Amino acid sequence: MGYHGGTMRVLGRRIYWRWYGEVLLEGGVTLRMTGDVAKWLRPGDRVRLRTEFKKPVLGFDEYALEAAFPLWPPFAKTLEHVRESPFGGEAYRYRLKVREATYEGDYEAIAELEQFHYASEKEVVALWVCTQCQKTIPANAKPLCDCGGEARLKEIRGSTPASRFLVLELAERLPFEPRILGYLRLDPPIPRMHRRTPEGVERDIRERIFPRDWFHPTYEGGADWQKALDRVNTAAARIARVVVHPDYRSEGFGALLVRVALEWAKERGAPEARRE
């Protein structure tokens, strides 16, 4: 990629969805990226931009961005995974891509996998919002709003505004095989709900640090969440969840996702990409 832009200052950000946001740089440049990346860039941050294009708005595939860590394009790793035969040798070879969730369809696939994780029709795994009337609709699958408007995925059950996701994608698949085989959720190292100290047991630690609506119920938004994200600067990351499609749970994909997540956290400083 050719060099144009150099070191620039972040002026602002707009977060629309987990899969779509914009970052405004000095000089009138707007970068389109996922909301899960854009929300970590604070006004005043210095970033390094590389692009071949001289235009005010740069799309997903038109630039690279770095700060303390590479920020864009999203993390991705292509690999092969061999299933061995019980009699020795290779039984099957998967060609896979492990990457950060980037597109709306990725998050819809995550919501679908959550249904396998909870395995109960009584458990609602996602929140959707109508783009016409702005009504929030709890549902396991994409619902139809009463007003006739299109519902789009807003949030995944149990996740927080700080959560970031890796998806395990079949790079080569047969028509009957799912595109996304599993996912991993990476969070800041939020303390456990209760902890034991010399003085006794401290309860509900997370709610003392983060807004209550991050956990009860699944996050729906609030005035304080971006301020909380702006203060995050961790020395570690926490693997909060690993879910694999039930038809593929004997293939070692869960362990594979964990190994790649460790690379992601090391190479990109995920989730917030600020620690030194």
Task: Annotate the PLM regions.
Residues 235-237, 258, 263-276:
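Conserved GNAT acetyl-CoA-binding A-motif
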Residues 17-24:
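Short aromatic-glycine-enriched beta-strand elements
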Residues 244, 249-266:
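Conserved acetyl-CoA-binding loop-helix of GNAT-fold acetyltransferases
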Residues 1-17:
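Structural detector for short beta-strands of small beta-barrel domains
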Residues 61-104, 129:
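Conserved N-terminal entry element of GNAT/NAT acetyltransferase domains
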Residues 125-127, 156-159, 163-165, 173-245:
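Conserved acyl-donor/pantetheine-binding loop and adjacent beta-alpha core of acyl/acetyltransferases
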Residues 3, 34-50:
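Short nucleic-acid-contacting surface segments enriched for D/E, G, S/T with interspersed K/R
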Residues 140-150:
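Cysteine-rich micro-motifs
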